[in-house]
């Protein structure tokens, strides 16, 4: 779900249809980074969508991708601060943008010589902006450790898989990120790194 064009009326219709939570494909919390990702929404749209969900007590998650083109320590800080302001039920944060062949991003990176060759893109290949390449994963881990509602897929994935299997075994249903804040799992998972 995109935060752009989200409305209270849309949320009401989703609730009436049985929706139990929303995962926004937010990607970033900086207008500069959102433009680089060619997103059709702004930071103000993210704030508004979050406020609508909070006003109704509706569980929501913002999924983020740190390290995209043009990412800087300033935009990383803006994204973290926006998540603190928006107070989502959970934040799913990843480092690095998966680059697929034959996409505008792949073509731009190939033209600049930042990808070893198109063949490299047929396997999982992730781009991290040079300005944040050193230290980005640790900065995101620090943000997660300081908050109880952040999940970091790919950083200790086996522990998360075992935890989520146990939660499912206890009968928990739906988006498991909904339980992260309530059970303080995000901080525990980040600390296990």
For each predicted feature, which ranges?
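Proline-aspartate-enriched helix->loop->beta-strand connector
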Residues: 19, 88-89
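Catalytic cores of alpha/beta
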Residues: 9-13, 69-85
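Generic recognition of well-ordered alpha-helical segments
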Residues: 49-52, 81-82, 96
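A structural motif corresponding to the C-terminal end of an alpha-helix
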Residues: 49-60, 86, 136-151
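Soluble or luminal CAZymes and related metallo-dependent hydrolases
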Residues: 6, 45, 71-75, 132-136
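Flexible glycine/acidic-rich beta-alpha junction loops that bind and position SAM and/or redox cofactors
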Residues: 32, 36-37, 66-74, 89-120, ...
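Conserved SAM/AdoMet-binding glycine-rich loop
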Residues: 1-61, 66-68
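Radical SAM enzyme core and accessory elements
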Residues: 103-193
């Amino acid at each position: 779900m995109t935060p752009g064009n989200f409305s209270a009326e849309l949320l009401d219709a989703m609730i009436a249809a049985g929706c139990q939570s929303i995962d926004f494909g937010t990607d970033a919390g900086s207008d500069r980074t959102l433009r680089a990702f060619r997103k059709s929404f702004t930071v103000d749209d993210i704030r508004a969508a979050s406020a609508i969900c909070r006003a109704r007590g509706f569980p929501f998650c913002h999924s983020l991708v740190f390290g995209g083109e043009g990412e800087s320590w300033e935009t990383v800080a803006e994204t973290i601060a926006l998540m603190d302001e928006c107070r989502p039920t959970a934040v799913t944060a990843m480092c690095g943008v998966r680059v697929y062949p034959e996409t505008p991003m792949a073509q731009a990176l190939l033209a600049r010589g930042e990808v070893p060759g198109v063949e490299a893109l047929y396997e999982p290949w992730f781009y991290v902006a040079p300005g944040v390449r050193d230290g980005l994963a640790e900065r995101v881990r620090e943000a997660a450790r300081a908050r109880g509602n952040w999940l970091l897929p790919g950083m200790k994935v086996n522990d998360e898989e075992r935890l989520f299997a146990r939660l499912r075994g206890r009968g928990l249903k739906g988006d498991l990120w909904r339980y992260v804040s309530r059970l303080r799992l995000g901080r525990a998972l980040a600390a296990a790194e």
